[in-house]
């Protein structure tokens, strides 16, 4: 009976394997979902399996918790505005050290441990991400004021040629969110927003944001308030009502941006759920919150 059940589970995945065969799926691997060792193993196995059944995962990773720890060790206090890290020159060097120097290589090694072929990149590789300094505005006393985030960028252009070559050669690209401006200066990119831009440029079928929450909820402390499916207009209403704040704001911005650029659906899932990526792609009910245009 147990063997029959296993076979049924495999057969349930068949329509989705057919549907998404040779499609690109952008996986945004969030900082908080990378802390748990078991969760890291689940995600790596999921991505390798996707590749072997003919689906093309592309990874963009963050690293917020490890960046925070590195900053604190160096006597710096992390500062955020609307979920975006304020980045001076010293902070940018720490960000690059952690993202490019440590986390990217760790993810590549984990994927290769489970039989995948992976290549670590940053937005600097092959002029992958051209960026410009981000101008951030806040409302204060009913007035719009400009806030200086420092060396924080936003994506101007994604050159997909290098990613296309790697995908064609059966590699899993793993991308650190560091961009370069037209003067050759490095800029810190929010990983969620960069993932949305890359997903759109790559014509990805899905963007899956792996984080440490179950999805979009009215009350983060009450799992029963989880939304299984939302449209852009519904999300915009939640922002207006103050139900979406802090670090979830860049995720939502990335969702909307990716959908506007042609991605069919965006999914926010909890990386601490065993094999969340496989459950999202290969089961009828999926997991987390799905966001669609309308």
Curated annotation (Swiss-Prot):
GO cellular component, one term: cytoplasm
UniProt record, GO biological process: arginine biosynthetic process via ornithine; L-arginine biosynthetic process
Classification via Gene3D superfamilies: Acetylglutamate kinase-like (3.40.1160.10)
EC number from the UniProt entry: 2.7.2.8
Keywords: Amino-acid biosynthesis, Arginine biosynthesis, ATP-binding, Cytoplasm, Kinase, Nucleotide-binding, Transferase
PANTHER family: N-ACETYLGLUTAMATE SYNTHASE, N-ACETYLGLUTAMATE SYNTHASE, MITOCHONDRIAL
Protein family membership: Belongs to the acetylglutamate kinase family. ArgB subfamily.
Protein name: Acetylglutamate kinase
Natural source organism: Methanococcus maripaludis (strain C7 / ATCC BAA-1331)
